[in-house]
């Protein structure tokens, strides 16, 4: 595995009304490397349980993706714990509404976001409430190409709201 190609320079998180969380993260990324990383949940938001592990993949042409998976989250003590349970019978299963989402590389919005479960592809910036992701799904964010060996800053700003009733979806 290559050395980490990024430096996390900013992370700010806040709770809203006890059931929502939003954060702004800045990553300084060097392309043409592959790395795995996860983000810690700030104190006081463990109950929301919505941060997911990230896998950064660099392809041969210098483009890269950040994929979100429902596992391998670390809390403030560094202990991994599950975020989603894909068992429909699980009382812990939730719907997440992500709103708003703005992703940019070097100040430019990403090309699109792909939701594998539905096959939807949407632009890189979203009005509030425009994206729904079921707990058994993943969210894949595709960034603009970065020339191999180049670098750019990645900004992600997002809000997660926990909705207990997924049965109605």
Predicted segments, located by residue:
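Beta-strand-centric surfaces of beta-sandwich/beta-rich domains
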Residues: 2-169
